[in-house]
Amino acid sequence: MTNSKTIKTNRRLGRRLILVLALGVATVFMAAPASGLAASTFGAKLNKNIQPSNSTPAQPCTMPAKSCTRIEMDAYNNAGHERAPKDGVIKKVKLIAGGPGHFKLQIAEAKPGKDKGRVVRNGPRIDYNGQPNGNSLTYDVESFPVHVPVEKGQYLAISAKKTSMLRCSSGGPNQFLFTPALSPGGPFQTLSYTDGCWLLLEAVYQ
């Protein structure tokens, strides 16, 4: 009789242990996507409510317009996430622009305290449409598939003569600008000047 009770008790304890372990495993798997999501993007955090204010007509680098490199030094709506959080591949870039234009995607490294930067890699040319209605209460977030490797700590950058992918409502060194545009693989260069407009560009990992 005692042996029978012992067996039943052991079975109940075994079932409870299995249930506890199963719940623990489920909790781990549920938490994993959340932690992965936190590191899946960098640069600006864009949504349809972000206005590309004072971005049109498109702002040139110099007069007359020559191509320059713009490094995104401050991520709009995502402060502290300007740099790539991990090694990987960018599968998509998103942007908000006031009007149509184009640029070459670049990956850069920067030394903010020394006002220096360099480009390590060029990506594809991207042609964007901008906003169909300048008086709209919401704004189009455009998305483009890419395949661009990036290493932890690197920045998003673009090469263009002019751009309207901007939100100009503040000041400070939100962008490092280099004229002429930087070529990949070169040494660190001292910036030409800074820009107080935010570059509205976001990267999404593969």
Segments and roles (model prediction):
Residues 3-6, 24, 38:
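Low-complexity intrinsically disordered segments
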Residues 12-25:
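Sec-dependent N-terminal signal peptides
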Residues 27-36:
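C-terminal segment of classical bacterial N-terminal signal peptides
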Residues 135-149:
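Beta-sandwich interaction modules
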Residues 36-125, 145-155, 159-206:
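Beta-sheet-rich sandwich/jelly-roll-like modules and their strand-loop junctions
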Residues 126-138:
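Short proline/glycine- and polar residue-rich coil/turn motifs
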Residues 1-14:
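N-terminal secretory signal peptides that target proteins for export/translocation
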